[in-house]
Amino acid sequence: MLSAKILERSGYLRKQCPLCKSYFWTLRHDQVYCGDQPCVPYGFIGSPPVKVAVDSLTELRERFLRFFERRGHARIKRYPVVARWRDDVYLVGASIYDFQPWVTSGAVPPPANPLVISQPSIRLTDVDKVGRSGRHLTGFEMMAHHAFNYPDKYVYWIDETTEYAYEFFTKELGITPEEITFKESMWEGGGNAGECYEVLVRGLEVATLVFMHYETKEGKYVELPLKIVDTGYGLERIYWLLKGTPTIYDAVFGPFLDRARQKLGVPEPPAEVMGKASIYFGQMDPEVIGLEKAYDLIAEKIGVDGKWLREVFRPQEALYVLADHSRTVSWMIADGVIPSNSGAGYLARLLIRRILKNLKLAGIEAPLVELIDMHLKELKVDYPEVWAARDLILELVDLEERKYKEILKSAPTVVKKALDEARRRGAASLSPDDLVALYDSFGLPPEIVADVAKTQGVEVKVPDDFYSRLAARHAKKEKQPESTLVEMAKVIDLPRTRELFYEDPYMRSFKAKVLRVVDGKYVVLDQTAFYAEGGGQPGDVGVLKYSGGAAKVVDVQRVGHIIVHVVEGQPPPEGVEVVGEIDWERRYALMKMHTGTHVLIQSIRRVLGPHIWQAGAQKDIPSSRLDVTHYKLPTPEEVAEIERLANSAVQANLPVYVKIMPRNEAEAKYGFILYQGGVVPAREIRVVQIGPDSDPYDVQACGGTHLKSTGEIGIIKIQKVERIADGVVRFIFTTGLHALSYIQELERQLGQAAQVAGGSRDNVVEAVKRLASRAEEAERKWRHYAELYAKQMAQSLKAEQVGRYKLAVVELDDEDLAKKVAEEATGRDKDLVLVVMGGNKLSIFTGGADVAPIVKSLREVGFRGGGSRTFAQGVYSGDVKTLIDALRRALS
């Protein structure tokens, strides 16, 4: 039983709901049910419980924050919606995500204790219900107060938390105590769990009070050393309660919806119908009974025609989806998410395409950019960071809309192929897995697939929770496998290796004692200056010298707190002293690359924008790579400016500071830009700052070895920029002497090019233009003579009559010429089958005959290849006679 003094003192009764069997607390003796959906209907739509003058979300949020500030809570600035400090999820789904796992595990103290926050959060688990249910959102603000109770420090727990909730709703918002029900439940999320109260008013859950004291491990609850108060007050839910509008969207997005309806010519829906529909939707699960069945049941309850209800709902649903999804997408893009096919970008693209799909199905025609821009103007007061990213948001949305339109053009062809494939495997229609594949591979929404399939006489059932399934599959990050170089059990008992490479990155040699040798090639020392691979920087190489021998170090890896040296040759015996000598030239080059990487990514951000985040990096010699999130290939001018900025930072000889800082202190000072290189799993983090405190050029949490100043880099030269994936651009670059060697090689090649073109290095461009002009003229003449030759050859072909077709076999090594001959010959004679041989390559052209039976026959004699209906290409290494015999069999 979960009880609180305020409830007992106020006369609350504990009852059990006969429907859901949950226990709940109420002041009403006549209350039978728990007060939650679906056990009871909403009772506030059209009849809010109070007449409180709360005119905006802004005001409600501020009243909540001030309420808890007056009660000793420190107000904390909201965190980003992208959880860059976590290695398990992409997006923040609740305020407690801000403090998981570091604070909740006890590894790091909270930024304040107790604290209050209003955290924008994103959950896509019910994305299919958005716009339909009247209450579901993908983006919402979780207002919350948190307290962290340690064994030696008590802050507050169940009694105080429940009393705060009681006072906020009764005294701050004026809701009578009899309206408030406290329902007992169990909460679990993010690896933690605890008992909770769900706070309910007239059928609507407006807050959850979680008393977190468990960690979930392998399906079991393990007691935490901390007892954490984790509350969540739904900003939008409470505002809806106070307004009593038909749907949550009308309360939260009212002004935007009014303008959108006016712009698009969509009539305002009947408030009474929408309100009743929300009430009934709240009491049923469309995923269980089916969406279409839900519409019919609701229409029957309201007393209207089902078809009419769908016609009313469809445009409103599209606008509700637009309002919710566009705010969520704007939060994501403003926080650096680029729509793409992976990670958080996948989720952003999913939301944009759901908007476009719903608008299309509702018959609403308008540029999405214009609609979202209208919404951004509404959001700029509460979310200035979103307004600051307006240009980027609109550019990305426009790009996504253009891509989507191209995708729809391909729908008939793609769906036909999918249906053909389904028939080949004996299926009458497309399965949910087929729909997922069509979405992930081609971007086709299942509703569009179903419409296209219907024109081909096939009914396709679209799961009502299709997008929720997709979101769930892409919501979590893949765990990186831990090092398996050496079994942990073989070294875990050893003391932590002293890391000399951090104490002095310029140390070239050192003395150490051999603690253990594993499997004859893995050496553990008590201390080492050999850097262990990490953060995209390779491990050092070198040699371990000892009395009577030496072993070559070919790799260095970290296994937990132990550093393991991989050696070739006879390893040193355990217990002896060794002298480690690092390949300094290689290490120093890698230090230049690593510090250069930090300089380069900051330069890229300054030119391309703050949405740039590192998507991967590998420091190596002679070249390194840096992958960043960006939606298009940078222009040559942008690349040149990036390179100029980077080398300006090098020439400025900025100092490089490395400092160990408490995690909270570092995050408070520098923000989450610290995690450009990824999550750092530690209570204290190693911060690398380039430039002075007054004006740092770049700051990152990093475990690599770095230079003392940027001047040591010498030069940063970008060698290549390419798109390696949707939303990811790769920079290949080099530094120092390797950059000089690269530039010298370019100079050498430039000189050779000038010589070949008949000019000098000073006028090589003009010389190449002249050469290109002559080449174009030669190409034009070749095409002219090739066409003449093709006509002549086509006229003189010797063809053999085989059945109704004519068979001709010729030898031509030039593929372009072969195509011209084929076009000319098959254009003259539709019954011609022309086979062109060139080396072991074989091409088959027909004037109209289906090439498939021919290919099938040729495969029996060793041909490998395929093609379209009238053309096939592949390889054949057999003799000509066997080939011709197979052709005759196929055509006769």
Swiss-Prot record:
Pfam families: tRNA-synt_2c, tRNA_SAD
GO MF annotation: an example: ATP binding
Keyword 4Fe-4S recorded: no
Cofactor info, note text: Binds 1 zinc ion per subunit.
Ligand binding (Zn(2+)): 594, 598, 702, 706
UniProt-listed CDD domains: AlaRS_core (cd00673)
Protein name in the entry: Alanine--tRNA ligase
